[in-house]
């Protein structure tokens, strides 16, 4: 019985997916401990909330634990995993622990290759504005709240559903969003795209008969699976056939303005405090959910207009000085797949028309670089200046002709932009300072250690 579990230990507690669950469990009154290879702002926050944090992994770290939570990034050879098995302590996958939390609430789960974090944040923000006090677990820090997780007293738990390891199939939400489906994390699915699409069908089919699948029909792969889903469906998009759709969409002062048409309801004029057509789609998904659960139109409009974004999702670091006496704009973004990168580049062009766009990119995983190589070359060639660094391996072994140098050579051969290759991420900030010009927009992108570059530039260049 659940009351027998009092102490829960997280291996890799500093990761964004693990830390959010740990914070909610702390707020539920559980004793929480965790280990990670290095301290960061996340582990420091959890320690202040009462978690016992260990630096490094050791068998002694799990002393007293009633359950041990792991992610797919944690190897079976991890000494804490080995010790837990020896002591017969239950080892719980991260997604299964999230599923247990979801059983305590009505779950709203957001799935899709791109846009999960922003969409989850938008849903949580609207429900919060509507007075529904949701619990949420997000894959990025909600800027307005200063955290990626919160225990609310309301009926709903809003969370990302991770398809990368197929663990979203543990979840049993009452509302499921699918933003899009692209070929990513294909190792999980035996490099079979049909298996990946079937997993999304299975995810939606886990809904109860009274649930709702909220699907973006602008995405061709989502449209393809739609006939296979037998649960109630609400569609959204720019497509005229969408039940929740955006019309009269325009870019104004770094924001998106549009009108939302909903079947049987009054039109809704919306200002979204984020740039990009992809973010309009994210907002439509959130509006569809909010409408379904009874949030007022006033709450929807206010939350979207005041939405301050999510950490590392088109996160603006303001203006910074250049060597020629001018200033450049600095933006940081988590995007690391060619499709989401193209959407973010388009958003940057829309937000800063006429400016030179400098992209600083660290590829994430050799397998993704290999599988999407030509698409990467195409999207990287759409910038005005390009700084490339070596692939962040995320535990993978190098793959021949799928490293940063190979990508730089291919972009150079394409002939549209001359890449600057920087081997070490620690040297990227200095390279950017040397090449940046007045009025440039510098967009730092990637899911690995590149995340340290924008803060380093922002801190160094601060007045």
Curated annotation (Swiss-Prot):
PANTHER family, sorted: UDP-N-ACETYLMURAMATE--L-ALANINE LIGASE (PTHR43445:SF3), UDP-N-ACETYLMURAMATE--L-ALANINE LIGASE-RELATED (PTHR43445)
Pathway(s) of this molecule? Cell wall biogenesis; peptidoglycan biosynthesis
**ATP-binding is among the record's keywords:** yes
Matching entries from InterPro entries are given as: Mur-like_cat_sf (IPR036565), Mur_ligase_C (IPR004101), Mur_ligase_C_dom_sf (IPR036615), Mur_ligase_cen (IPR013221), Mur_ligase_N (IPR000713), MurCDEF_pg_biosynth (IPR050061), UDP-N-AcMur_Ala_ligase_MurC (IPR005758)
Q: Which GO terms describe its biological process?
A: cell division; cell wall organization; peptidoglycan biosynthetic process; regulation of cell shape
User: Where, subcellularly, is it found?
Assistant: Cytoplasm
The organism's superkingdom is given as Bacteria
List its EC numbers: 6.3.2.8
Main location per the UniProt record: cytoplasm
Protein name stated in the entry? UDP-N-acetylmuramate--L-alanine ligase
Question: What's the catalysed reaction?
Answer: UDP-N-acetyl-alpha-D-muramate + L-alanine + ATP = UDP-N-acetyl-alpha-D-muramoyl-L-alanine + ADP + phosphate + H(+)
| Xref: HAMAP family | MurC (MF_00046)
Record: residues binding ATP: 112-118
Q: Does the record bear Cell wall biogenesis/degradation in its keywords?
A: yes
| Gene Ontology CC terms, in alphabetical order | cytoplasm
State the family named in the UniProt similarity comment for this chain. Belongs to the MurCDEF family.
Give this protein's Gene Ontology molecular function annotations: ATP binding; UDP-N-acetylmuramate-L-alanine ligase activity
Q: State what this protein does.
A: Cell wall formation.
Identify the gene encoding this protein.
murC
UniProt keyword list:
ATP-binding, Cell cycle, Cell division, Cell shape, Cell wall biogenesis/degradation, Cytoplasm, Ligase, Nucleotide-binding, Peptidoglycan synthesis
């Amino acid at each position: 019985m659940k009351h027998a579990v009092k102490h829960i230990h997280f291996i890799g507690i500093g990761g964004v997916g693990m830390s959010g669950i740990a914070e909610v469990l702390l707020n539920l009154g559980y004793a929480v401990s965790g280990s990670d290879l290095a301290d960061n702002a996340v582990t420091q926050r959890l320690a202040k909330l009462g978690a016992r944090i260990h630096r490094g992994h050791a068998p002694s770290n799990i002393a007293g634990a009633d359950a041990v939570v792991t992610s797919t990034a944690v190897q079976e050879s991890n000494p804490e995993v080995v010790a837990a098995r020896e002591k017969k302590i239950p080892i719980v996958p991260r997604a299964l622990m999230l599923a247990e939390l979801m059983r305590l609430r009505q779950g709203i789960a957001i799935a899709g290759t791109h846009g999960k974090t922003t969409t989850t944040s938008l849903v949580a923000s609207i429900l919060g504005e509507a007075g529904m006090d949701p619990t949420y677990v997000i894959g990025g820090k909600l800027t307005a709240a200063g955290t990626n997780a919160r225990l609310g007293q309301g009926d709903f738990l809003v969370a990302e559903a991770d398809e990368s390891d197929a663990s979203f199939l543990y979840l049993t939400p009452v509302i499921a969003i699918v933003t899009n489906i692209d070929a990513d994390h294909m190792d999980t699915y035996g490099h079979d795209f049909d298996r990946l699409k079937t997993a999304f069908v299975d995810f939606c089919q886990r809904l109860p008969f009274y649930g709702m699948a909220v699907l973006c029909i602008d995405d061709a792969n989502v449209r393809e699976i739609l006939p296979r889903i037998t649960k109630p469906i609400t569609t959204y998009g720019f497509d005229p056939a969408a039940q929740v759709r955006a019309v009269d969409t325009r870019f104004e002062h770094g924001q998106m303005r549009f009108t939302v048409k909903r079947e049987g309801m009054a039109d809704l004029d919306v200002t979204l405090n984020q740039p990009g057509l992809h973010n309009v789609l994210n907002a439509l998904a959130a509006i569809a959910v909010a409408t379904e659960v009874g949030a007022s139109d006033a709450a929807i409009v206010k939350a979207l207009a005041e939405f301050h974004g999510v950490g590392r999702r088109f996160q603006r670091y303001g203006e910074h000085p250049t060597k020629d006496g001018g200033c450049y704009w600095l933006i940081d973004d988590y995007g690391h797949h060619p499709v989401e990168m193209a959407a973010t580049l388009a958003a940057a062009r829309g937000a800063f028309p006429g400016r030179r766009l400098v992209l600083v990119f660290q590829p994430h995983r050799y397998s993704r670089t290999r599988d999407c190589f030509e698409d990467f070359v195409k999207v990287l060639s759409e910038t005005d200046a390009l700084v490339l660094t070596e692939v962040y391996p995320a535990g993978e072994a190098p793959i021949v002709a799928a490293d940063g140098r190979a990508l730089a050579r291919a972009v150079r051969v394409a002939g549209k932009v001359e890449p600057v290759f920087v081997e070490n991420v620690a040297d990227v900030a200095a390279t950017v300072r040397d090449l940046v010009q007045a009025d440039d927009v510098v967009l730092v992108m990637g899911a690995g250690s590149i995340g340290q570059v924008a803060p380093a530039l922002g801190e160094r260049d601060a007045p």
